[in-house]
Every structure is written in C-alpha cells, then in structure tokens.
Amino acid sequence: MDPDKRAKLVAMEVEETPPPQPPPPPAKPLPPRALAFLDGPTDEHRVAGLLLLAAADASSLQAHASEIAAKLEASNFLARLLKTAGDDGAALTSAQRAGLEVARALAGTSDDVRDALAKGSALEACGACVLSVADARTMAARGDSIEGGSNEDAAAALRCLDALVGGDPRRLVTSGVDGAPLLAFCRDADEQLWPAATSLLRCCCAGGGLDDESVRALTLLATTVRSKSETYAREAPLIECLALAVAARAGAARTSSTAAHARKAARDVVEEAVPRLLRRGGAREVCRDAALGAAAVCASGRRGAAWLWGRDGAVVRVVAGCAAAEARLALDEALALAAGSGGDDRQRRADRCARVAPLCLGVLERVLRLLLGDDESGDESDDSEAPDAPAPAPDAVLGCRDAVRDAADAALGFCGEARLQRDAAARGLPEAPAPAALELLLALCRPSLSLLGLLAAELDEDEADDGDGDGDGLALHARLAELRPFVDDLVAADRGAAPPPPPATTGDDDSAPSSEVDSDDEIDYGT
C-alpha cells in the first residue's frame, strides 16, 4: 500500500480526544441588600427580600442556601406568608409566589437545606397553601370565585411542595396533603401541573395514603387517559401510581367487600397495562421509567410469579428483555458521566442512573430466582388468594436466560471499569472521575454484584463460562475472580473498615494473585 495512503488511513483511525467541557459560569452575587432585608424589622422588609431572592440566579441562591433558610426559619415569616395563601378563593400575591419559588429553589440545593425547611414550619405551610389553592379551584369551578386557584398558582404551590417532600411519604403526611386533591390536580389537562402533581401522587401511593375510594378513582383515571391523544402519555405514570397504591394497601379483606373489588380491579388494570407499556415504541424516558417501576411492583410476591409466567411466558419475556436493555443503558450512561460527558443535565442523568439501574437489576434477580425455584416471597399473607404460577414455557425460559446473561455481561464490564476508575482516583491520575461520579459508580456496583453473585452461586462453571460451541463466552467465574479484591474492598467499605490501597498496576501482572478460584471458596458478591 502506498505509504501516504496508509498514513492517512491510520490518521483516520486515531481517536481524537474530545475537547474539555467549558467551566461553569461563575455564580452571580445576590442582589444588594437581599439578605439584609430578610433581617429587617418588619414584614415589608422581608417581602422585599423575598422578591429580590426570587429574581436571583440559581447558583447564587445555592451559594447562600443555608444562610437564607436559617433566616427564614428564624423569623417564621415564610410559614406565616404561605398559610394565608388562597384564603376565600383569593389568588396568590406576588410575595406568596416569590416565597414558594424561593423555598423550592432552596430545597433543591442540598438535602441538608431541604431537611431544615421540612423540619420547620415551611412544610406544613406549603401543604396548607396547596389545599387552599385546591379549594379555590373547586370554588371557581362552582362559580363562587373568579380569580383564585389559577394554574399558575397551583403549579407554584405543587412544585414547592414536591421539592420540600423530596419523595418521602412521611413528609407528605406531615404537610397535610392527601390523595384527593392530588388526584384532582392530576385530572387537570394543564401540562404545567402534571409533573409535580404526579410526583406527589406517586409518593402518596407508595406511603399508603390512598383509601379504597381513591384507588377506584385512580383506576378510572388510568383507564381513560388512553382515549385522548393529549393525555396518552400520562398512562404509564398513572399505572405506576396505581401499582404502588395497590401494593401499599395489600392486606386482609373480605372477598365480597368493596375494598377487595376495588383492589382486584386495580390489579387487573395494572397487570394488563404493564407489558403493553413496556412494548410501546418511541415512549419518553419518564414513561419508560414509570413502566419499569410498575413492572417491579407487579413482579413481587406470589401473585407476581403467576403474572410473570402468564400468557405462555409472553409477559416475562417482555419484562426481562426490557429490564436487561435498560440496565445496560443505565450502566453505560453512568460510565459516560464518569468520563466527563454531559451538559447542564448531568445531575438529572446521574439521578436517573442511580434509580433505574438497581431497579432493573432487581427485576432480573427476581426473574432469576423464579427460574431457579428460589422464590423467597411466596409466603406473603396478602397473596393468599393469588393464583398458582403456571409452568414456564420453554421459549420463555430461553428468553429469560438470554436477558439475564446480557445484563450479567453488562454488569461484569461495568464493575471492571468501575474498579479501574477507583484505582485511577486513588492514584490521583488526571483522567480520574470526579468524586460524585465515582460515588455513583461504586453505588451501582452493589446491585450489579448482587445479580452476578446469585448467578455464580447457582450455575457451575460449564454453564456460566462456556465460550465454545453454542456458549456465549460469558466467562462468569473467571471474570468474577479478577474482581475479587475489588469486591472485598466494597464489603470492607460497607462494614466501615478502611479498604486496602489498590495495586500498583491495573493490567495483567505475573505478581498479581492467582485468578483461579476453587468452587468451594465462599465469596460474598453481595447476595
């Protein structure tokens, strides 16, 4: 080959290093005298301070979040301001909206600030504000009010409460908001209410805050949103809420009672919808996550086993295949974030990885236990009337096997990369990930190793490591043996002991411990 042509081809194959991400813009200072106004002698001074803070940059609020939260709690002004919101059907004032926006922004800065606001009186005041706005909307619907309860008022109150609650059902109970007003907000066609209202409803359902009448209303809502194109995408989040509500309210109930009929109708709707939602093409990320969450709830318990193996194995093939694909995508996304990719939504993407990967790996672990006949949740009293699981169809077993092996291969590769990133950070190398990214990687190693440990414990080396013939070359035991020191470090870290320093090299080394592991060795991979 011509040397010049060869040089050009080689140059084309050289991977170019992507340009570094531009540094974040410096935080803008708070408006002059904003903090001084919060310490003012009158409420008029504090209102002026809130209005200035509401117009401030988010980064500047984050830099002074603890100080602002302490000032607001010391004067109790924010709680007094919000408790009067929406009285007698009146609209929110500009000061009340500013208070809601500032509280929401402060709660999103850190868990410590959110805890400080939630432990104070701001949480109850925000809950009272949501209820007042809901009452004002009811009055406006009856024609008793013409200005209160607007969509803007409702959106501001719901977003603030969602930020203060932070997904904790106990905080939602403390706020005084139950399922009835949240269901009313979810019925509204306005899209600006939907994200916060659904998030709060999910939290309420997970905490058992919906009574049987509300469960029946949610069932009706979840079945009717499909009929309209503008609400078609709302089905998956509502199905997830319904699955959580039924699971939280599971318990003894007379077969002929209204409660039993409501729960059975809700379960039937959820179990029919989940496979269809998982197969839905072009679904948005939030809809896929909601469908996976509902699938995880449905797969639990004795009833979950019967549901998974139903329809001649069609359900379990869909659930296992989607869980394996989403687990691989989430693990790859976490590695990409550790490598420095991403933009303004890095934190959102990291939060999704931390939520989706363990969820999907847990679903696959449940499927694997059912395949192995190791069902640990088959004696639940609330599933006493659950149908017996049918015998799994052979093609369903093969589909589950392929899905579990695909996820195991992704988990093995992820744990190996996480070990290399951990070693790079320990040596202070320039390519080491940021501390937050490394913490995410190590956190995701635990559910990954839990699945791998179960698979390694149940399969012998011929089944798991066959790379010839019709095998897939997973090499499970050999690759886990290479990760054994890394696993020991994770176990030591979980137990509070300082892990030993990483080895001097990360590649193949003749001086490294032997990777041969006897089958009788007891290795804790997180199971």
Question: Where are each of the predicted segments found?
Answer:
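Positions within ordered alpha-helical repeat solenoids
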Residues: 55-58, 83-87, 101, 105-108, ...
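Long terminal accessory regions outside catalytic cores
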Residues: 266, 270-280
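Acidic, Ser/Thr- and Gly/Pro-rich intrinsically disordered linkers and low-complexity segments
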Residues: 32, 82-91, 134-151, 322-352, ...
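Elongated alpha-helical scaffolds that mediate protein-protein interactions in large eukaryotic proteins
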Residues: 13, 22-180, 186-196, 203-220, ...
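Long C-terminal extensions of eukaryotic subunits of large macromolecular complexes
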Residues: 2-5, 9, 14, 28, ...
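Extended acidic/polar regulatory tracts at the flanks of large eukaryotic scaffold/adaptor proteins
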Residues: 253, 284-290, 300-358, 363, ...
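Extended HEAT/HEAT-like alpha-solenoid repeat tracts in very large eukaryotic scaffold/adaptor proteins
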Residues: 45-52, 95-103, 150-160, 197, ...
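N-terminal "cap/leader" segments of large eukaryotic alpha-helical scaffolds
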Residues: 2-83, 320-347, 487, 494, ...
